[in-house]
């Protein structure tokens, strides 16, 4: 599978392909279908003491599929209709973790969304064969020590307390009202995403069709929409790009979030020192680090791992369900943690 970087005791490298070789008893399954069908297959699948999901978070297999979806989105009348179209390309992070949460099984999901996004990407292969839009489940009957962290304080006890915490942790720009559906955002403060960003004099992207044809979509943004969960008062983020879209896609289902949130700049209080403090306090063999941490701190991230006997990968949005060791800000559903900016999973093998 493609990754954005590697971590070894000798240093950190960017870009490459992660090859997994398993000298251990395991079960590997590949599931295909829309999100609802895959969730039902995951519910029926045998679970191990450790479970790893690997799949393309957003996948379009051809230019024809992209153009067809793009035109249908332009004609969509509401967020429900747009969400049904997005379901053809997106596997929502929280939805795919629910079967494991419901069976009290530990699971880590690698929801691949490459920084250099394009048609037919990411390319994930098993024994040399590209799986396309599918979900891999690797099940191991061994109890790996697993811990999730988002480098943030614990969430508040209500929506206002969580907002206050987030305003102190990031570059606060504005409180916002959100018009949304299952996998789709229509308006922020009664404006399209492009109109909203440009009301703040932010211009980042050009024409979506041209970028797709050139395979020039950069899959990250320094500006985020923080959403707050009605179930837990936890929070997760969605990066915002100013493509001219009538409906904006979400990588997780939005029904569980309030219709209000925060517009923030991706600037973490305490910066790299906070990341370093958490990582130095943990004893672990392997680590999955959110690729956005690399973007935030660039070459300085190397200093965090220098001299540490650790292996890991820089990858998009590692997410988790299992035992909670604190009231994680990113716990947006009971025992489901996801954060598309700072998520990190530690493993002891």
Curated annotation (Swiss-Prot):
It comes from the Archaea. This is Uncharacterized protein AF_0772. It comes from Archaeoglobus fulgidus (strain ATCC 49558 / DSM 4304 / JCM 9628 / NBRC 100126 / VC-16). The lineage of its organism: Archaea, Methanobacteriati, Methanobacteriota, Archaeoglobi, Archaeoglobales.
């Amino acid at each position: 599978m493609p990754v954005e970087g590697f971590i070894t005791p000798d240093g950190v490298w960017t870009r490459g392909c992660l090859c997994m070789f398993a000298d251990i008893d395991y079960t590997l399954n590949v599931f295909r279908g829309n999100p609802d069908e895959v969730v039902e297959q995951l519910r029926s699948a045998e679970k191990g003491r450790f479970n790893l999901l690997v799949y393309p978070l957003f996948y379009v297999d051809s230019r024809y599929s992209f153009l067809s979806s793009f035109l249908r989105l332009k004609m969509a009348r509401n967020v429900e209709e747009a969400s049904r179209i997005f379901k053809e390309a997106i596997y929502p992070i929280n939805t795919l973790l629910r079967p494991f949460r419901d069976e009290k099984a530990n699971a880590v999901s690698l929801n691949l969304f490459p920084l250099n996004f394009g048609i037919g990407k990411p390319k994930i292969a098993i024994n040399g064969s590209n799986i396309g839009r599918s979900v891999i489940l690797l099940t191991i009957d061994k109890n790996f020590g697993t811990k999730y962290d988002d480098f943030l304080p614990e969430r508040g006890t209500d929506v206002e307390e969580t907002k206050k915490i987030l305003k102190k942790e990031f570059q606060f720009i504005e409180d916002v009202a959100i018009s949304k559906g299952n996998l789709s955002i229509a308006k922020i403060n009664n404006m399209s995403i492009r109109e909203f960003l440009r009301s703040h004099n932010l211009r980042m992207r050009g024409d979506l069709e041209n970028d797709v044809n050139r395979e020039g979509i950069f899959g990250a943004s320094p500006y985020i929409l923080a959403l707050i969960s009605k179930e837990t008062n936890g929070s997760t983020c969605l990066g915002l790009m100013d493509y001219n879209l009538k409906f904006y896609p979400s990588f997780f289902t939005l029904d569980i979030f309030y219709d209000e949130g925060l517009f923030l700049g991706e600037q973490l209080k305490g910066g790299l020192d906070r990341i370093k403090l958490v990582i130095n306090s943990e004893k672990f063999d392997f680590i999955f680090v959110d690729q956005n941490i690399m973007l935030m701190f660039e070459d300085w991230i190397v200093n965090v791992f220098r001299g540490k006997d650790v292996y890991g990968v820089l990858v998009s949005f590692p997410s988790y369900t299992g035992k909670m060791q604190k009231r994680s800000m990113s716990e947006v559903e009971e025992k489901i943690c996801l954060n598309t900016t700072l998520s990190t999973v530690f493993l002891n093998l």
